[in-house]
């Protein structure tokens, strides 16, 4: 699949806004949709391949966490920064109807509705990062500044420091 022939809703959205980005295809493994596999397929640093997790806060409703592929979301930290007492990952069956995206193809840009987004602080450590382009098999290469701006995200510490504490 040539990156010149790829068109996704995310790409159309960003083109309309005049945002610079790249679309990078990769081979999908239906048995491993994780960010570590994506990073390996792209020959990129897994710290730069960010995954998108949709959650539900007890006060805020739906929220989005965007974090490096080799880290796990800390639900307590995310709840605190988002003004919730607790938050829980969205059940997989609710992902498509809520966001318009499927597992392994969920982009923080261009969801059906605008949800408050929180991106982990390490996003600013890189000249560019990767997030899903809205379909399996295509990653969006974008500057952290543009990603934050287009998602209207809050940058915050939302991951476990010790991977042994993780649940997701």
Question: How would you name each of these model-derived features?
Answer:
Residues 1-168:
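Extended, low-hydrophobicity, polar/charged segments
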């Amino acid at each position: 699949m040539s990156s010149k022939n790829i068109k996704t809703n995310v790409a159309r959205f960003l083109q309309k806004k005049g945002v610079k980005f790249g679309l990078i295809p990769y081979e999908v493994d239906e048995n491993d949709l994780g960010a570590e596999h994506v990073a390996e397929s792209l020959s990129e640093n897994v710290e730069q391949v960010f995954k998108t997790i949709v959650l539900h806060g007890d006060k805020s409703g739906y929220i989005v966490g965007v974090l490096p592929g080799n880290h796990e979301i800390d639900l307590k930290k995310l709840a605190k920064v988002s003004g919730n007492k607790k938050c829980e990952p969205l059940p997989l069956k609710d992902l498509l109807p809520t966001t318009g995206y499927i597992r392994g193809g969920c982009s923080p840009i261009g969801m059906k509705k605008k949800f408050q987004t929180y991106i982990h602080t390490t996003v600013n450590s890189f000249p560019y990062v990767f997030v899903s382009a809205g379909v399996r098999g295509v990653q969006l290469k974008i500057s952290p500044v543009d990603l934050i701006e287009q998602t209207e995200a809050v940058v915050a510490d939302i991951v476990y420091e010790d991977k042994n504490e993780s649940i997701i």
